[in-house]
Amino acid sequence: MLIPKVKAKEFEKFGFKKCKGEYGKGGCYYLCVARGCKMLFVSSAIFDVNDWIDNDPRIHKDANCRYRDHRTYLDIIYELIKADMLGREGR
């Protein structure tokens, strides 16, 4: 399982946007990935990949999706690992 190695706010550098509502107040961030319709979710304690659904209460009405971006969610996760922002649980 992947976990964040930095504060969730640091993920803004990679295009993550603060969640709306209570999730945002809790310091959670998300990034929608057009290729594969995935949503990357991060807080100070967890990193998760979910299917991107329009009525998700964490996502803003105008999601921060870059449709011209040709990366998949796995490409982005790889870049986050290389940037030392994500690591394995227990290490």
Language-model features, listed with the residues they occupy:
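Short acidic DE-rich linear segments
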Residues: 85-91
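Structured beta-rich ligand-binding regulatory domains in large eukaryotic signaling proteins
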Residues: 80-81
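Absolute N-terminal positional cue centered near the fourth residue
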Residues: 3-4, 42, 49, 88
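Amphipathic alpha-helical segments
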Residues: 2-20
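Acidic, low-complexity, intrinsically disordered interaction modules
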Residues: 19-77
